[in-house]
Amino acid sequence: MTYARIQGVGSYIPQQILSNADLEKMVNTTDEWIMQRVGVRERHVIANSPDNTTTMAVDAAKRAIEMAGIDPAVIDMIIVGTATAEYYFPSTACLVQKHLNLREDIPAFDINGACAGFVYALSIADQYIRNGGAKHILVIGVDSLTKVVDWKDRSTCILFGDGAGAVILQAHKEPGILNTILHANGDYSDLITAKSGVWERESVPHLHMYGKEVFKLAVTKLGEIVDEIIEKSGLKQSDIDWLIPHQANLRIIEATAKRLGLPRERVILTIEQHGNTSAASIPLALDAAVRAGKIKRGDTLLLEAFGAGLAWGAALLKL
């Protein structure tokens, strides 16, 4: 049997930091309130730097390729999960292909699963490798949500940061990705929006979110999907070494960890330093944990994410 196995990870975050103390000067909020409500102390932001969605994706990809120790010429597919592409078209994936000087006989495309974008992209890549359609896939999660945040809305501007994370998936005989599950429900599409499309456009596109409703649904749906993927994989909760959650809200993360019976020290947390980086949050956290020596080859990881759409998903894998 052929598995899709992670061979390298990489990430990138902008240099500029926006702290809760900085936000106290911008909106009616406090560090204590933000930490209690969501668990974020600071976030990295593009602001006026030369960074953008494409450049962050490229930098994260370079680091993943370096760790994987592969010749970039062997990459035979690029999938980018993002909700904040630099352009309507061309795709971010094609721009990454250009900047990395990758060969032209490969597919390169974006998918928009919002905060669940990386898990969606990972699932698609897994199927391609399992079915023999590719052997080395570059999967990237990247977002620049601070560019669509309303900095006068204290309920949302405190949440988000910018960044990118990437993995190299390689066809392998040793177990890698064991299972992925993806769900969506468009009936809840109005709960998180940034209306800047062709047909419905705000003069300045801003992210809008009904936080209380999203919180309740996230806790419920993520709890259900982690149970579902463990059962589907024939494993037990005790088989999970690490939970790598989407870093949206510490209370949501704690609810999922409690459902799994995992202590906090077995949960990879970067939300305090990064905030919610949308599709980038899981690969950012994975990269940080691998480079810190927390997560090691052979560990069993459970990834889960929930975002606008509403779309949510989970992946169970052996590193």
Curated annotation (Swiss-Prot):
GO molecular function: 3-oxoacyl-[acyl-carrier-protein] synthase activity; beta-ketoacyl-acyl-carrier-protein synthase III activity
A single cellular component GO annotation: cytoplasm
Pathway: Lipid metabolism; fatty acid biosynthesis
Region (ACP-binding): 247-251
Domain of life (superkingdom): Bacteria
Chief location category: cytoplasm
The enzyme's E.C. designation: 2.3.1.180
Function: Catalyzes the condensation reaction of fatty acid synthesis by the addition to an acyl acceptor of two carbons from malonyl-ACP. Catalyzes the first condensation reaction which initiates fatty acid synthesis and may therefore play a role in governing the total rate of fatty acid production. Possesses both acetoacetyl-ACP synthase and acetyl transacylase activities. Its substrate specificity determines the biosynthesis of branched-chain and/or straight-chain of fatty acids.
UniProt free text on domains: The last Arg residue of the ACP-binding site is essential for the weak association between ACP/AcpP and FabH.
Subunit structure: Homodimer.
Name of protein: Beta-ketoacyl-[acyl-carrier-protein] synthase III
